[in-house]
Regions:
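Alpha-helical scaffold segments in soluble metabolic enzymes
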Residues: 64, 68, 98, 102, ...
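Regulatory N- and C-terminal appendages and interdomain linkers associated
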Residues: 148-259
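Conserved kinase catalytic-core helix
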Residues: 3, 92-106
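Conserved ATP-binding subdomain of kinase catalytic cores across diverse folds
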Residues: 1-82, 121-125, 151, 161-164
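Beta-strand segments within the central parallel beta-sheet cores of soluble alpha/beta enzyme folds
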Residues: 9-13, 114-117, 183-188
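Catalytic activation segment of kinase domains across protein kinase-like and atypical kinase folds
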Residues: 27, 31, 105-110, 114-173
Length: 259
C-alpha cells in the first residue's frame, strides 16, 4: 500500500451461503453472500498477544513468547542480552511512529486501532472498516460504529502512543525496576520520532528537500496548508497531486502577482 508496510490479500473465496449484515450499524440489515479473505503477513503477533498473557498472569508463557518473537523476527537483537526487551521495545516504538506517520501522509485511516490490531512488527493489519481522506477532514472516521471518533484520522498518532504504553505495561513482569524506568523514557521519545518522520514525509510531498531537521517555519507551513485544505474542503490526495504539476516559474509568477 503506497510503500507502507501492510499485510497482503492472497485470495478471496465466495459462497452462496447467505449472511446478514448491518454494515452501517443503523438497523438496515441486508442479506449478502458469505466470503472469506485470506491475508498474508510475516507474523500476526500483536500488542494484544502479549497483553493477554500479562493480564492472565502467564509470565512464563509471556517470557517464552517474547523470546520466540525476538529470535524469529528481530534478528538484530540478541535474545540472550539482559537488555534485549528494552531493545525490542525501542525498535517497536520507532517503527510504530514511522508507520503512523506514513498513514497520515497518505490520508489513511485504519478504523479500529485497538491493541489487538497493532502489529508487533509495525505493519498495517486488520483494517476492516478503513478509509482514505477525500476532502481533508482531520475528524474523519471510516468506522460507522465509532460514534465518539476515538480512532479518527487526527487521533491516530496519540492512539499509537496509547497502544505502545499498553505494550510497555505488558512487558513489565519481565523487566527490572531500572529497565521499567528506561522503558518509560523510551516511550517518551515516541512523539519526537513521529513528528520528525511526519514532517519529512509532508515536506517531501511538497517537493522540498527531505532533511533530517526541520524548522518552526516548516511546521507552520504544513499546518497552514492543512488548515486551508480543511476550510475549503480540498481533496487531500488531489491537492498534492495538483501542486506537483506546477513549475517553479508558475509559482514565482504567482508570488509576484500577489505582491
Amino acid at each position: 500500500m503506497a510503500g507502507i508496510p501492510t499485510s497482503r490479500a492472497a485470495s478471496l473465496v465466495v459462497s452462496n451461503d447467505p449472511v446478514t449484515r448491518d454494515q452501517f450499524y443503523n438497523g438496515n440489515i441486508k442479506v449478502e453472500r458469505a466470503a472469506i479473505v485470506l491475508r498474508l503477513a510475516k507474523t500476526w503477533f500483536r500488542i494484544g498477544s502479549l497483553e493477554m498473557l500479562t493480564v492472565n498472569s502467564e509470565t512464563e508463557l509471556l517470557k517464552s513468547t517474547v523470546e520466540f518473537i525476538i529470535r524469529n523476527y528481530f534478528e538484530t537483537i540478541d535474545h540472550k542480552d539482559t537488555d534485549c526487551l528494552l531493545a525490542l521495545f525501542q525498535e517497536i516504538v520507532h517503527a510504530t511512529a514511522r508507520l503512523i506517520a506514513q498513514w497520515q501522509s497518505v490520508g489513511f485511516t485504519h478504523g479500529v486501532c485497538n491493541t489487538d490490531n497493532f502489529s508487533l512488527l509495525s505493519i498495517t493489519i486488520d483494517y476492516g472498516p478503513f478509509g482514505f481522506l477525500e476532502s481533508y477532514d482531520p475528524n474523519f472516521v471510516p468506522n460507522t460504529s465509532d460514534d465518539e471518533g476515538r480512532y479518527s484520522y487526527a487521533n491516530q498518532p496519540d492512539i499509537g502512543a496509547f497502544n505502545l504504553n499498553k505494550l510497555r505495561i505488558a512487558l513489565l513482569p519481565l523487566l527490572t525496576k531500572k529497565q521499567a524506568k528506561q522503558a518509560s523514557t523510551i516511550l517518551k521519545g515516541y512523539a519526537g520520532i513521529y513528528k520528525s518522520e511526519y514532517m519529512k514525509l509532508f515536506m517531501k510531498k511538497l517537493g522540498f528537500k527531505c532533511l533530517d531537521t526541520y524548522s518552526e517555519d516548516d511546521e507552520q507551513f504544513v499546518a497552514i496548508l492543512l488548515k486551508i485544505m480543511e476550510d475549503t474542503k480540498a481533496d487531500f490526495t488531489m491537492t498534492f497531486r495538483e501542486l506537483s504539476e506546477l513549475t517553479l516559474d508558475q509559482i514565482e509568477l504567482s508570488i509576484k502577482q500577489e505582491k
